[in-house]
C-alpha cells in the first residue's frame, strides 16, 4: 500500500511539473515570442504592398518631417515608442490608433491615413510593448496596452492642444488593438477626464480567456482545462495579470461611450459571434454594428476600403465636435 502511494505521489508530481512547464511554454510562446511586429523594414514593405493608397500620404509626411516620433514610460519601466502627426489644419480632434497582436504601429498606418488625410485629425500611433521600436517585454492582450493608450490620450493635450484648443479623442483599434480600445474606454470617469468622445473596435475579442480557450482547442486539439488554468496562474505570477483581467466584455458593459463595432463574417481567429456578444453587452450609450461580408480576421478595411472609410467617418463625426 505504501509503495503504491509513493508511486501515485511521484506520478502526480511528474504530471504537475509537466503542467507547469507547459504553462510556461504557453505564456512565453504566445506573449513573449519573436514576431513580425518587430520587423520594421518588413512591415513597411508589406503595408505598402497591401495598402498602396497610403504611400503618397506617408511619403509626404516623411519627406516634410511631419511624421514625428517620441517615447513614454509604462509605469516607469518599459519604454514605449509612438508616432504622431498633426492634422493638415489646426484642430484638437485626435485619433489614438492601436495595433493588433504581433503587429506594430506601422501596420496601422492605413487606418492612421483615414484619420489624418481623410478626416483631418491629429494622430497618435504607438508601438505597444514587445513590438516595433518599443522595448521588449511581453504582450498583455490589451491589459497593459489600454493603460498605455490612456497615457497617450492624456499626452495629446500637451502635443496638439493650446490655450484655445481642447483636444478630443477617438480611439480606434484592430484585433488586440480593438480589445485595447474597448478596455481603454471602459470607465466613463476616465473618458470624461481624457475627453474621449467615441471609439471604433474592429474584430476585437470578448476576453483574453475566451480567445485563448478557443485557440488552445483549435491549435492543440485539447480542452482548456487544465492547461489554460495553469498558464493563467503562470501569467499572473510572471507578468502580474490574469487572462480574465483582459476583458473587453466587462469594459463595454460599464461604458456609455459611443462605440462602433466592426467584424468580418468569415473571421475564425476571433469568431464573429464574439462581436454580437460584445454589441449586446453594451446597454448604455450609443452603439453601431457593421458585419463586413466575406471578410476574414482583420480584413474588413482591406476588403471594403470605401465602405469602411464612409462608415467610420459617418460614425466618428457624430461625436467629435
Positions of PLM-derived features:
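The serine-hydrolase catalytic nucleophile loop
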Residues: 101-114
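Conserved alpha/beta-hydrolase
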Residues: 112-135
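Hydrolase active-site cap/lid region
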Residues: 183-241
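Short beta-strand/loop motif that positions the catalytic acidic residue
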Residues: 254-256, 261-263, 267
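Short alpha-helix in the alpha/beta-hydrolase fold that links the catalytic acid
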Residues: 111, 248, 257, 271-280
Amino acid at each position: 500500500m505504501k509503495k503504491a502511494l509513493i508511486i501515485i505521489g511521484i506520478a502526480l508530481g511528474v504530471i504537475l511539473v509537466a503542467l507547469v512547464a507547459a504553462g510556461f511554454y504557453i505564456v512565453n510562446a504566445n506573449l513573449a515570442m519573436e514576431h513580425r511586429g518587430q520587423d520594421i523594414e518588413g512591415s513597411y514593405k508589406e503595408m505598402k504592398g497591401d495598402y498602396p493608397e497610403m504611400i503618397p500620404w506617408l511619403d509626404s509626411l516623411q519627406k516634410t518631417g511631419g511624421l514625428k516620433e517620441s517615447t513614454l514610460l509604462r509605469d516607469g519601466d518599459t519604454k514605449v515608442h509612438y508616432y504622431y502627426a498633426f492634422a493638415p489644419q489646426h484642430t484638437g480632434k485626435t485619433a489614438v490608433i492601436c495595433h493588433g497582436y504581433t503587429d506594430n504601429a506601422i501596420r496601422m498606418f492605413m487606418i492612421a491615413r483615414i484619420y489624418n488625410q481623410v478626416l483631418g485629425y491629429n494622430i497618435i500611433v504607438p508601438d505597444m510593448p514587445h513590438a516595433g521600436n518599443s522595448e521588449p517585454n511581453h504582450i498583455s492582450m490589451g491589459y497593459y496596452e489600454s493603460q498605455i493608450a490612456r497615457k497617450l490620450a492624456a499626452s495629446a493635450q500637451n502635443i496638439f492642444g493650446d490655450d484655445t484648443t481642447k483636444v478630443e479623442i477617438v480611439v480606434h483599434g484592430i484585433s488586440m488593438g480593438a480589445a485595447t480600445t474597448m478596455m481603454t474606454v471602459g470607465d466613463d470617469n476616465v473618458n470624461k477626464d481624457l475627453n474621449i468622445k467615441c471609439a471604433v473596435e474592429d474584430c476585437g475579442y470578448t476576453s483574453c480567456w475566451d480567445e485563448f480557450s478557443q485557440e488552445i482547442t483549435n491549435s492543440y486539439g485539447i480542452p482548456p482545462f487544465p492547461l489554460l488554468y495553469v498558464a493563467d496562474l503562470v501569467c499572473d505570477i510572471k507578468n502580474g495579470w490574469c487572462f480574465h483581467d483582459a476583458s473587453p466584455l466587462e469594459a463595454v458593459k460599464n461604458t456609455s461611450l459611443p462605440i462602433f463595432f466592426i467584424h468580418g463574417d468569415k473571421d475564425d481567429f476571433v469568431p464573429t459571434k464574439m462581436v454580437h456578444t460584445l454589441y449586446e453587452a453594451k446597454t448604455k450609450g450609443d452603439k453601431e454594428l457593421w458585419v463586413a461580408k466575406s471578410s476574414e480576421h482583420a480584413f474588413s478595411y482591406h476588403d471594403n476600403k470605401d465602405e469602411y472609410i464612409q462608415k467610420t467617418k459617418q460614425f466618428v463625426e457624430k461625436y467629435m465636435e
